[in-house]
């Protein structure tokens, strides 16, 4: 694991920073993500120089900042969310009229405040999870009802659906001034710490009853965890790694590639695929900034978002198996295999049991207040019912990589 963290495409962090000192971090990161296979430092420098020269060959009409929370060229090769691909494609598509400075590693904003920094105009684009963004922009909670999405394919199907425009995107823009562009899709489970290293592999929700688990900022995720007797406790990120290592908490709710990219794998012993609500690392932008662009540039933003959505769909599905190791059996040399993280895939019967414990479909009362609140904010849409229906329009056995891409901003 150490080698994977300290090098990207075979180049050390120190050498990457040296190259970035000459050509800028954005050009260097774009060169890294655009490369195939391993690079020498000299090859990276040449690629970064070529990228820099291309990006600055003409004066940009608009220069925008993307606040990418903790993301960088290294971890975006683990969780394939498409943020750098979007920035590079938008620059190329507009022939340099739009230039994006990618600012990651929490240098300008973090998971909890990137959306606010976008609303305030500190950054123009941002990348963060919808769940962490919900604290500032609560309409994001529309995605977080328990078992609303049965699988990853259903998530992609919804985000490609033109109906996502009226249910998610338009109300978010109207209420919070954020234009939702594209997202990666996984489902959240429980990531058990080292306390569970020598215990039997989890096969039932009953084995998790009474455990204490770190919860993110999601308010709806907390409801689901309480109903499943998973005792959600808010723990600062800094304390989560130590809590999982020392056994102060049993686990943490998040998705598999987050464990891998955020360096949680050394302190996680079992990744329990509970699939109890959505996990989305997404890219959004200020709606004011979007509206300030002329028509062709607006079209370019949407087409680049579409390309990034398609790219993330294919690349993250491959990375879950080939990079993360979220499979059974696991491939060797994956992050989970290297760190002895066992994957606990529950049976359909066990997932149904968990769903019946906490889903609004079977246990509506704890969710009624949020459903009414979101209905009011959306202008009268029962968002849970609508998304639940759309998520089941495709066959249950559809593979995520086989979901048909659609340009969601156009009418069906």
Give names to the regions the model predicted.
Residues 2-155, 180-412:
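N-terminal secretory/targeting leader peptides
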Residues 152-175, 201, 206-207:
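Short, solvent-exposed loop/beta-turn-alpha elements that line the ligand-binding surface or hinge
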């Amino acid at each position: 694991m150490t080698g994977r963290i300290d090098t990207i495409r075979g180049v050390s962090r120190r050498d990457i920073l040296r190259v970035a000192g000459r050509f800028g971090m954005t050009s260097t990161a774009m060169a890294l993500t655009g490369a195939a296979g391993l690079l020498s430092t000299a090859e990276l420098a040449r690629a970064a120089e070529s990228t820099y020269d291309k990006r600055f060959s003409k004066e940009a009409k608009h220069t925008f900042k993307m606040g990418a929370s903790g993301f960088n060229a290294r971890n975006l090769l683990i969780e394939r969310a498409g943020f750098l691909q979007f920035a590079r494609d938008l620059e190329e598509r507009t022939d340099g009229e739009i230039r994006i400075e990618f600012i990651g590693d929490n240098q300008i904003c973090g998971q909890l405040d990137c959306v606010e920094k976008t609303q305030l105009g500190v950054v123009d684009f941002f990348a963060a999870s919808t769940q962490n963004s919900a604290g500032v922009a609560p309409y994001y909670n529309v995605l977080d009802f328990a078992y609303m999405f049965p699988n990853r394919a259903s998530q992609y199907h919804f985000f490609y659906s033109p109906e996502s425009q009226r249910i998610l995107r338009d109300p978010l823009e109207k209420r919070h001034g954020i234009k939702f562009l594209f997202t990666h899709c996984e489902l959240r489970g429980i990531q058990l710490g080292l306390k569970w290293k020598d215990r039997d592999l989890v096969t039932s929700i009953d084995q998790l009853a009474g455990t204490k688990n770190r919860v993110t900022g999601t308010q709806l995720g907390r409801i689901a965890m309480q109903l499943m007797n998973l005792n959600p406790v808010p723990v600062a990120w800094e304390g989560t790694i130590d809590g999982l290592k020392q056994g102060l908490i049993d686990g943490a709710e998040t998705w598999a590639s987050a464990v891998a990219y955020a360096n949680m794998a050394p302190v996680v012993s079992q990744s329990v695929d509970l699939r109890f609500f959505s996990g989305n690392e997404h890219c959004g932008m200020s709606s004011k900034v979007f509206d300030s662009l002329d028509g062709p540039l607006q079209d370019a933003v949407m087409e680049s978002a579409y390309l990034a959505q398609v790219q993330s769909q294919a690349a993250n599905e491959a990375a879950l198996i080939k990079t993360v190791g979220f499979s059974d059996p696991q491939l060797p040399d994956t992050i989970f295999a290297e760190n002895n993280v066992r994957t606990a895939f529950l049976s359909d019967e066990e997932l149904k049991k968990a769903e019946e414990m906490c889903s609004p479909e079977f246990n509506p009362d704890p969710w009624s207040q949020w459903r009414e609140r979101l209905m009011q904010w959306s202008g009268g849409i029962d968002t849970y019912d609508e998304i639940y229906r759309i998520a089941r329009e495709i066959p249950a056995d559809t593979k995520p990589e086989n979901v048909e891409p659609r340009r969601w901003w156009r009418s069906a």
